[in-house]
């Protein structure tokens, strides 16, 4: 966004746990590379991009004063988190005086309260918060947890009102496969860079970030103008359903059909003359018919999913997907089967075949 819009911002990284990688990041002058690998409109891509927007990285367990001083910066506006599914949780043992609180929501509440006091409740100094943890309606969960800390720590009605009216905590859905550090490719990457980057992050080309927030927020966070696949929508739920139905659902039925046909890699299954036709039929003729989103959006998403399945850099074994296939089918495919039957008056043969293969 800095390169393609007038966003003109920097990032401070705060690690959520005691032991993290901020020392390594600071040792590299807060620079690292992202290695994107995959297919983009049928073309193979293997790119390296330097990330240079981080101004510094903090460990709140050893630099708590510096962490809290972030709240004193008037231009601070966005908080974006990814602390894993376990990160958004209420820990009643946390205290306001802890330096810092052990839980992420506790740390965030401390930061918000310090900002509230620093600016005497000025509503123009509220923060926009985007949690990216893989929890359905993660923003709702984080907001509820902050309210629990406001109650536990008796922070008062004035702060609670400021948080409600000046701050926004928005649910998001993120979708991108990020294998992380490219151990098998790092020697070639360092040779290409001509220096050591020990924090290279490998990821697929595809990316999606759905944010349940009003369009006014999109104006402040102009990701769409930067050409990024970031959607500001009234409700995250249809996009969550789309991902489960058109990404996870096909995986669940494709894998046993491929395995019984002697094919062991997802990419090879998609390129198989028979299995490839099968999964296309399941996605475009069956599962897509059960969703209530614009058809062009669904078609584009399904095409992107197939490109991801065909990623030449990822050998995704079908046996790893087949673990717990029955409960996976129940949550990912059975709802679509029922909806298809209700709407069409007949069973979707591809989904039935997948169930039989399981």
Model-derived features with residue positions:
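Substrate/ligand-engaging "lid" and interaction regions
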Residues: 2-358
């Amino acid at each position: 966004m800095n390169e393609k819009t007038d966003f003109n911002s920097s990032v401070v990284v705060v690690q959520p746990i005691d032991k993290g990688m901020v020392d390594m990041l600071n040792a590299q002058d807060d620079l690292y590379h992202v290695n994107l690998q995959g297919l983009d409109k049928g073309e193979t891509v293997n790119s390296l991009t330097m990330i240079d927007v981080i101004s510094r990285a903090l460990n709140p367990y050893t630099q708590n004063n510096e962490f809290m001083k972030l709240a004193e910066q008037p231009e601070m506006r966005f908080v974006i988190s990814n602390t894993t599914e376990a990160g958004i949780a209420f820990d009643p043992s946390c205290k306001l005086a802890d330096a810092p609180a052990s839980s992420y929501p506790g740390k965030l509440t401390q930061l918000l309260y310090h900002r509230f006091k620093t600016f005497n409740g000025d509503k123009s100094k509220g923060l926009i918060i985007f949690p990216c943890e893989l929890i359905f309606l993660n923003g709702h969960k984080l907001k509820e947890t902050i309210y629990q800390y406001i109650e536990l720590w008796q922070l008062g009605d004035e702060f609670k009102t400021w948080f409600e009216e000046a701050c926004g905590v928005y649910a998001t859905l993120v979708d991108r496969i990020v294998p992380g550090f490219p151990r098998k490719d790092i020697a070639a990457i360092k040779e290409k860079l001509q220096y050591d980057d020990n924090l290279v992050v490998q990821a697929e080309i595809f990316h999606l970030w759905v944010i349940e927030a009003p369009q006014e927020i999109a104006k402040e966070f102009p990701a769409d103008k930067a050409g990024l696949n970031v959607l500001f929508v009234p409700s995250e739920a249809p996009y969550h359903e789309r991902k489960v139905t058109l990404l996870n659902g096909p995986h669940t039925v494709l894998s046993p059909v491929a395995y019984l046909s002697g094919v062991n890699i997802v990419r090879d299954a998609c390129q198989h003359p028979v299995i490839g036709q099968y999964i296309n039929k399941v996605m475009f003729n069956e599962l897509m018919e059960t969703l209530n989103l614009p058809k062009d959006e669904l078609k584009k998403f399904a095409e992107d999913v197939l490109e991801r399945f065909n990623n030449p850099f990822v050998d995704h074994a079908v046996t790893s997907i087949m673990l717990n296939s029955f409960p996976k089918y129940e949550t990912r495919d059975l709802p679509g089967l029922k909806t298809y039957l209700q709407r069409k008056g007949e069973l979707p043969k591809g989904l039935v075949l997948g169930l039989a293969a399981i």
